[in-house]
């Protein structure tokens, strides 16, 4: 390492190099308003027994009056058999789950030893060590290609045929796209435009509308990227590159009018969908997200839509309120000097826990969190500053109320740091908090009638359905660091960028017997937890149903699992020092490297479509975004693109492309738990505040109308299979989407 490299490495540990390191963004009045909202219990009116008796008259209790039924008894409809069998059955099942957990541990140890002694030996082991030692993506790619050459994976790439995608359709489509693209280029050279119409360009648009769709012909199947360390089939890569070239050619073509291009790219955008980065909870394990974000940022594939829960919400807030240049200076080991949430001594937090039931002080966390959120920044202000769409999952303190996904559509004036605190309020760690809203004069007030919220990981760690509903997200990049989930992660046939090396990719991890035992034990534990939940036998410590921390979906289209170490569990509620944060940054980046090629191919098409859509929306005088897109900003140095901040891009796109609401065919969208999906704007606590909200938020009629639309596959069900209809009706009867084990189980094929 030369002198310049040593100096650069030293700067990453120097806190003075961090932007706004010494700046406190939050105003003291904001904290005082937050403190008042936390202590306000709500006024309860005094009610007399009647008009002439005193209020506090002494009233004798009637004898023989039946006691009011307890809530738990009323909910579970307890009877004699329930009372007699509940605890014996509960202890029996817990005993069996404990035995299964012990057997699962032994199975994983067997698989680990099998892979070390049978699979990873000799030359392949040395190449694997070189791969894991790389700290930047170009060097990692070289090491991955060397390992693929040794294992014979390069030959697999050269063979078009594969069971998990339609190679014949893709092969023919590549030939057609190339042929039509050459014809368009020839017409441009010969200037045969006539009246401005180009038959070849129109034919190319027709081809693009047919194939620019989510997972068209299976080209986005993760299995296509799970057979090699570097990349995918050569045919798939050729198809992605050709598709990108054709999209750019249509955008630059003068044989199509701007209005036609605008409509064309609107259709492509709706059909292809959007990509979102989802950051899970996991206490201080969430600091691995910094490395994942840094890897995506350095390679230009950081999505605009970001969601976070609990600890992941803090990372998401930092990313969504900073520009790319600021993030590159922030995501360094010196950032550890600003992470001071757990700096109190052991006697201090024990005494607080004894008095309040929570280990940490809410006001202190609000002060610390505000720096990551740039003070009392709202969701809309963050969107207007960076072009990124921040989403934070929050769960109401009432176990029966629906969860919310706070963003610039559902809660535009909600203060980000209050939502981050609510999403991190784990019972026993932090008490439920009140969301705060910023009024027109800049002061803060309680949001949603002062209701309190808590940790989003308890019910919706990865809000995939809400993201799809709000932003048409159908491709999710999940960074999963929950410690209780990482222990059970196992991919028997390999995962993206990490193929099974046993039998040259055709085998199973640990052999077929080891993988079969692992799957059986894991599914059996999941089954018994569901039985306990559906029979309402599980106790509710702190008034919370804790079964969802195991039974919800924790993965996405691409799931990144940073590799943790045992000491992370010891430091699960302590601040990292710069050395520990440097290791977490490095591990987070290395865990993202195998997934980058898959993500690059996806965003290569998405970015081309979105940039073209914004270009022609601006040219046609129809802006689609209240703030310039990040991708648009990077390619518009003069900042000519400055649309109105009142216009809502997603509402316009959805209202234009989705079918209009019809009088009699009204269908309300329901969430996973059978209740109504909560996509409404949070209600203000004051009438004045409500008027301010309505003036600042985007068109609420468009947002609410999306709740009452009839999905396309529900109209005209005559063409649907009778078996699909029986399955849907059965799911409605049993009220359990999870019985199919797939979020798409209720949708017809």
Curated annotation (Swiss-Prot):
Residues 649-664 have a biased composition (Basic and acidic residues). Keywords: Hydrolase, Lipid degradation, Lipid metabolism, Membrane, Transmembrane, Transmembrane helix. Its main location: membrane. Residues 685-707 have a biased composition (Low complexity). It is found in: Membrane. InterPro entries: Acyl_Trfase/lysoPLipase, NTE, PNPLA_dom, Triacylglycerol_lipase_N. A motif (GXSXG) lies at residues 308-312. Residues 277-468 form the PNPLA domain. Residues 1-21, 619-726 are annotated as: Disordered. GO terms for biological process: cellular detoxification; lipid catabolic process; triglyceride mobilization. The active site is at residues 310, 455. The chain crosses the membrane at residues 87-107. It is a single-pass membrane protein. Pfam families: DUF3336, Patatin. One of its GO terms (cellular component) is membrane. One of its GO terms (molecular function) is triacylglycerol lipase activity. Its EC number is 3.1.1.-. Coiled coil: none annotated. Belongs to the PLPL family. Probable lipid hydrolase. This is Patatin-like phospholipase domain-containing protein An01g04180. It comes from Aspergillus niger (strain ATCC MYA-4892 / CBS 513.88 / FGSC A1513).
């Amino acid at each position: 390492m030369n002198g310049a490299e040593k100096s650069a490495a030293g700067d990453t540990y120097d806190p003075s190099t961090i932007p706004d390191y010494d700046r406190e963004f939050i105003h003291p009045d904001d904290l005082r308003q937050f403190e008042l909202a936390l202590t306000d219990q709500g006024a309860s009116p005094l009610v007399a027994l009647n008009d002439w008796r005193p209020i506090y008259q002494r009233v004798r209790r009637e004898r023989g009056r039946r006691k009011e039924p307890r809530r738990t008894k009323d909910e579970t409809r307890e009877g004699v058999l329930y009372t007699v069998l509940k605890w014996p059955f509960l202890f029996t099942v817990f005993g069996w789950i404990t035995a299964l957990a012990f057997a699962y541990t032994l199975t994983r140890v067997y698989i680990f030893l099998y892979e070390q002694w049978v699979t990873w030996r000799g030359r392949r082991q040395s190449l694997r060590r070189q791969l894991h030692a790389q700290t930047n993506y170009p060097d990692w790619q070289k090491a991955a290609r060397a390992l693929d050459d040794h294992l014979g994976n390069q030959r697999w790439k050269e063979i078009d045929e594969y069971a998990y995608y339609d190679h014949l359709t893709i092969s023919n489509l590549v030939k057609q796209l190339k042929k039509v693209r050459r014809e368009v280029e020839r017409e441009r050279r010969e200037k045969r435009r006539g009246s401005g119409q180009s038959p070849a360009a129109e034919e190319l648009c027709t081809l693009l509308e047919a194939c620019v769709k989510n997972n068209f012909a299976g080209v986005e199947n993760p299995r296509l990227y799970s057979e090699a360390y570097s990349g995918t089939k050569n045919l798939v890569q050729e198809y992605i590159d050709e598709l990108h070239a054709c999209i750019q050619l249509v955008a630059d073509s003068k044989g199509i009018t701007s209005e036609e291009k605008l409509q064309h790219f609107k259709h492509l955008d709706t059909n292809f969908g959007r990509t979102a980065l989802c950051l899970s909870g996991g206490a201080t394990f969430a600091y691995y997200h910094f490395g994942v974000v840094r890897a995506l940022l350095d390679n230009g594939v950081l999505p605009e839509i970001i969601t976070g829960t609990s600890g992941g919400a803090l990372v998401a807030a930092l990313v969504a309120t900073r520009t790319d240049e600021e993030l590159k200076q922030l995501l360094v080991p010196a950032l550890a000097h600003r992470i001071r949430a757990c700096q109190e001594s052991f006697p201090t937090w024990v005494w607080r826990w004894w008095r309040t039931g929570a280990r940490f002080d809410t006001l202190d966390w609000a002060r610390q969190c505000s720096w990551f959120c740039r003070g009392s920044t709202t969701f809309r202000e963050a969107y207007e500053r960076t072009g990124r769409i921040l989403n934070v999952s929050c769960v109401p303190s009432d176990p029966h109320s629906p969860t919310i996904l706070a963003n610039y559509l559902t809660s535009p004036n909600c203060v980000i740091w209050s939502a981050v605190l609510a999403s991190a309020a784990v019972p026993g760690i932090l008490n439920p908090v009140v969301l705060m809203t910023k009024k027109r004069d800049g002061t803060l007030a309680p949001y949603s009638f002062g209701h309190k919220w808590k940790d989003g990981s308890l019910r919706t760690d990865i809000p995939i359905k809400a993201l799809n509903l709000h932003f048409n997200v159908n491709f999710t990049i999940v960074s999963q660091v929950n410690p209780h989930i990482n222990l059970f992660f196992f991919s028997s046939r390999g995962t993206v960028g990490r193929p099974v090396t046993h039998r040259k990719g055709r085998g199973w991890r640990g052999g077929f017997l080891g993988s079969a035992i692992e799957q059986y034990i894991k599914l059996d534990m999941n089954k018994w937890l569901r039985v306990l939940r559906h029979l309402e036998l599980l106790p509710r410590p702190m008034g919370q149903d804790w079964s969802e921390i195991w039974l919800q979906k924790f993965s996405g289209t691409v799931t990144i699992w940073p590799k943790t170490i045992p000491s992370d569990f010891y430091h699960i509620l302590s601040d990292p020092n710069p050395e520990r944060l440097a290791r977490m940054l490095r591990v987070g980046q290395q865990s993202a490297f195998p997934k980058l090629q898959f993500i690059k191919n996806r965003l290569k098409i998405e970015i081309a479509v979105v940039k073209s859509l914004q270009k022609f929306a601006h040219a046609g005088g129809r802006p689609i975004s209240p703030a310039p897109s990040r991708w648009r900003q990077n390619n518009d140095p003069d900042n000519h693109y400055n649309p109105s901040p009142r216009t809502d891009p997603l509402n316009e796109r959805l209202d234009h492309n989705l079918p209009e609401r019809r009088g009699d065919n009204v269908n309300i969208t329901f969430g996973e738990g059978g209740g109504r999906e909560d996509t409404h704007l949070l209600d203000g606590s004051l009438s004045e505040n409500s008027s301010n909200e309505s003036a600042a938020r985007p068109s609420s009629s468009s947002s609410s109308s999306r709740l009452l639309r009839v999905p396309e596959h529900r109209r005209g069900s005559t063409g649907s299979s009778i078996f699909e209809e029986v399955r849907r009706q059965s799911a409605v009867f049993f009220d359990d989407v999870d019985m199919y084990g797939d979020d798409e189980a209720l949708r017809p094929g």
